[in-house]
Amino acid sequence: MIRVLLKGPVLSKSGYGEHSRFVYRSLKQKPDKFDVFVYPTEWGKSSWILNENPETNQINLDILRTRNLLESGAQNTVEKPLFDVSLQVTIPNEFEFSARTNIGVTAGIETDRVSPEWIQKTNETQGLIVVSHHAKNGFEKTTYDASKGEEKFTLKTTVPIDVVGYPVKKLEPSSEVNSLAFDTKFNFLSICQWGPRKNVTATLRGFIEEFMDDADTGLILKTHRINNSLSDRWSLKADIDNVLAQYPNRKCKIYYLHGNMTEAELHTLYTHSDIHAYVTTTHGEGYGLPIFEAAYSGLPVIAPSWSGHVDFLYMPRETKTKNKKNLREAMFEKVKYEIAQVAPEAVWETVINADSQWCYVEPKSLKKSMRVVKQNYIAKKRKAEKLQKYLIEKYDCNKMYQKIQDSVVKLHENNLSTIVANLNKNVTHHVVGSLATASVRKEK
């Protein structure tokens, strides 16, 4: 059995929180193979899951078990480490090392490259698990000129990288959300954090300008800035009102949703009878979980064809020509875009570099795409349902859990083989971090 320390925001209402719980579920599915310990972390100022359910109760029990172990005074040595594997679900510059095999789990970045700090920390792990090929490419294709003393070298990612996307979920609809009444006959939905990375104001402006005189069309915006607090709600409403004030004669409607919602409640938005399509003007996604949830729920999606979400918005093209293999068909309404440097307010030290680039949607293309989906809804819905069927099969939860399990086992076994080989070569191996620092050297 492999003793695993899972470190991440496992009780946070955030993308990384959901990522942590996905990894947790994957490992807990095989109790005969993985002995799971949990070290919870925060994710910024995001809200925590407060409602009790069987999963959160089990997570809390595993957290308590971990705390008891760490407070027991047990020593962490190479000969007998506390943990065989650590899985750290976070951004790479926060990776720490506390097991024999240390695996990073990250959503990557919205931009076209990762920072040198990310590469340095990633190379200290024994492997990386990312959620999309965009994230993988960001690590594998980014290089920097570096030096150590007089030695010059190319800094690049050298550890193996596995891609494991999220699984689909089957949740019972919320009767409370289904009872929400919208005055408009056709409604778009967008779910995201309000900030420069998600480019929400472009969604808002594009919608209003396209449907300015259409009283039967609405945009449902589920958003937050930092968390689900009342202060966040009212400060964000002021920002939305400032945008709306610039369109005093608009007839289209904006529905602003804010606050704690369960997973079932959120998923019910995607299947609500009065919600017809999902729209995003994101600058980029490591994966794009709300976009994925909308797609596997059968909603037509309007999005730029760039970054993590393209993994699941395309499907194999049906063709009778044998030579045309690996052709993919876009199953969403594509918005034209350009790749350009990130805005100064989006720069995040050690995470988003000032010279990074991401996508900017073309406003005219966004408006046209929304109009096309509304005017050709039957055909667009049929296409979305075809994609839905494909995603439900490809991203079945048991298949994705198995991929996490296989990746952890593979990376751990590869590392053990490397340790043995290094011992035979008289090379020191380190277990470093907050738990202990140890080294092994072959005796002569």
What are these regions (language model features)?
Residues 229-269, 275-276:
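Nucleotide-activated donor-binding/catalytic signature segment of Leloir-type glycosyltransferases, i.e.
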Residues 5, 180-198, 204-207, 219-221:
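Conserved donor-binding/catalytic core segment of Leloir-type glycosyltransferases
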